[in-house]
UniProtKB/Swiss-Prot annotation:
One of its GO terms (biological process) is thiazole biosynthetic process. One of its GO terms (cellular component) is plasma membrane. It comes from the Bacteria. This is Protein Rv3254. Residues 1-4 form a propeptide. One of its GO terms (molecular function) is iron ion binding. It comes from Mycobacterium tuberculosis (strain ATCC 25618 / H37Rv). InterPro entries: FAD/NAD-bd_sf.
């Protein structure tokens, strides 16, 4: 291998220029003299789809909590996105149509509390973040493939990364070594860190999984302005309907229609068939608008077999000099739209862990980050898993016995939220991770849901007891 580059005590390396990698680089820039992000893909200078990010062709939005966290990390981001035409969802009743688990929530009113979310396309959001990172004087993004981190057995730490030299193939002697004080693995779901750990003499992390079997099919389209007032339209899959869809309006006036199937159900592959599914799942005003839609380009397809949480927080030993980040730790059911928000929360954990280490001049950075990440991952993972098991025919490992009964109770809550705007707003805020990461209603909220469902039940009983009058024939 070729010689060392850089001072290992003042250099951080990030593997991958995904949204997670860009967030990590932004945090690291405040603690290291030099930050290098290595990305195998050629990065576009303007918003554009990337071959190594197949999910960027499908429905994306920035939840309210995620918007707050991203704007804190990248000041001015939200202002610039709106200036570029990114739709902003506010407290108005005409912004969102939300169908969840077979229930259409009563969101057709002005929300009592502030709620602001944004609808950038994934390529636009990545471009906004990337250009901000590139403006940092101590950060560079380099197009190179990291073959693996370099582990020093005597020190029991990662001391840098090995880069694949063009045309080197399997020639390890031609790999280039880049020294680093810290390596952040933001390589996404395809991370090889569990394999590297076993090669270095450490245990592989246990994995919690939810086998959901999601398949996507998406198509962009245009419609005349004003046909649809809402900027977000969602009809989620349910226990009795394994197909769902979402429609979003993006920054350039283009819409995307994403259809998906759970439990290995296949979504419709053509735009006409997607519209036919919309006819089945959405009110007539949406399908009338789709009848005037002009499709753009070709459909895009993607698969997401399982949600996965690598439990680095449970490892007793972990090498120094490397930390996992983003989807390399936990990847969530993308139909819930919470993955980017969870990454932004982890960026905050990374910042606090680095501050704590600098203040104490010691400490285990990886252990602190892994513990903090687990604390915020657990409630969202649990909420996702209960929903998938209860409504999407998923299987999970491990599977606590109380998850299915909890899902049944929450189904009743969603039923009440169809016509109770207070319950609908509570769900929308918790689902957006605003007020709490835990989807656990307070006693007053539970009482409101019970009272609401009881009134509906009593009304049904009265209607059943009413005598049916029939007219006698002359």
């Amino acid at each position: 291998m070729t010689g060392r580059v850089g001072n290992p005590k003042d250099h951080a390396v990030v593997i991958g220029a995904s949204i997670a990698g860009l967030c990590a680089a932004r945090v690291l820039s405040d603690f290291y003299s030099t930050v290098t992000v290595f990305e195998r893909d050629e990065l576009p200078e303007a918003p554009a789809n990337r071959a190594t990010v197949p999910q960027d062709r499908h429905l994306h939005m920035l939840m309210a909590r995620g918007a707050q966290e991203f704007d804190s990390l990248f000041p001015g981001l939200l202002h610039d996105m709106v200036a570029a035409g990114v739709p902003m969802l506010e407290n108005r009743p005409d912004c969102i149509y939300l169908g969840a688990a077979g229930h259409v929530l009563g969101t057709g009113h002005t929300l009592r509390k502030e709620f602001t979310a944004y609808v950038p396309s994934r390529p636009h959001l990545e471009w906004q973040l990337r250009r901000r990172v590139l403006q940092l004087s101590n950060v560079q993004i380099v197009r190179r493939l990291v073959t693996e981190p370099q582990f020093e057995r005597r020190q029991q730490r990662v001391v840098g990364v090995l880069l694949d030299s063009p045309g080197s193939g399997q020639d390890r002697e031609r790999e280039e070594f880049i020294a680093a004080d810290l390596v952040v693995d933001a390589a996404g779901r395809g991370t090889r860190l569990p394999v590297w750990l076993t090669q270095w003499g450490y245990r592989r992390p246990a994995e919690d999984t939810v086998d959901i079997g999601i398949s996507y099919a998406s198509h962009q389209f245009r419609i005349p302005d004003g046909l649809i007032a809402e900027k977000v339209v969602v009809a989620g899959a349910s226990h009795d309907q394994s197909l769902g869809l979402g429609m979003l309006c993006y920054e350039d006036g283009t819409w995307v229609l994403t259809t998906f199937g759970v439990a290995d159900a296949k979504p419709p592959p053509t735009f006409d068939e997607m519209r036919a599914l919309a006819d089945k799942l959405l009110p007539a005003r949406f399908t009338a608008a789709l009848a005037q839609a002009q499709p753009i380009g070709c459909p895009a397809f993607h698969a997401f077999p399982a949600s996965r949480w690598r439990r680095y927080d449970k490892l007793e030993r972990f090498p120094r000099g490397i930390v996992p980040f983003g989807d390399a730790v936990a990847s969530f059911n993308p139909t819930f739209g919470q993955g980017m928000t969870m990454t932004s929360l982890q960026a905050g954990h990374l910042r606090r862990a680095l501050k704590a280490r600098n203040s104490a001049m010691k400490g285990d950075l990886a252990a602190e980050l892994n513990r903090a990440t687990a604390k915020t991952t657990y409630p969202v993972w649990m909420m996702n898993a209960i929903g998938d098991i209860s409504f999407h025919h998923a299987t999970a490992e491990p599977l606590p016995r109380w998850w299915r009964p909890a899902g049944s109770l929450f189904d009743q809550f969603l039923g009440a939220a169809e016509t109770d705007p207070v319950l609908a707003e509570w769900f929308l805020r918790r689902f957006s991770l605003l007020d709490s990461l835990y989807m656990v209603p307070s006693v007053p909220i539970i009482g409101r849901a019970i009272a609401h469902n009881l009134r509906l039940w009593l009304k049904e009983q009265r209607e059943r007891r009413q005598p049916v009058t029939t007219r006698r024939s002359p």
